[in-house]
A protein has these predicted regions:
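Cysteine-centric segments in proteins
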Residues: 1-106
Length: 106
């Protein structure tokens, strides 16, 4: 059975332990965040993606099958249209405008 774990630290400093268990022969998958199960899937024997929220942050779990082996990845989704990502883009635009304004003044 394959096991992986990651630690996500939120903006407020809260710590979230994300992990998975993936059966080698059955392909059964369990993904958890702290002590809460967020995904259960059966017969995952090919590449697949899963998305779930940690607070208001959309996270992606990637399972990639390559030459009979599985590779696992965890990342924060900063592209999909969510309230958090809209706020992130708005803040970035503001910072760019401020940088350009300061650059023109000096």
């Amino acid at each position: 059975m394959s096991q992986m774990s990651w630690t996500y630290i939120a903006d407020d400093g809260a710590r979230y332990d994300v992990g998975l268990f993936h059966g080698d022969s059955t392909g059964h998958l369990l993904v958890y965040c702290n002590a809460r199960i967020v995904v259960i899937d059966f017969s995952v024997l090919a590449s697949k993606n899963y998305s779930f929220f940690i607070n208001d942050e959309l996270c992606d779990l990637v399972i990639e099958e390559k030459d009979g082996k599985f590779l696992y990845g965890f990342k924060v989704d900063e592209v999909t249209d969510t309230a958090r990502n809209r706020g992130r883009r708005k803040m970035l635009r503001t910072e760019v405008r401020q940088s350009l304004l300061i650059g023109f003044l000096f």
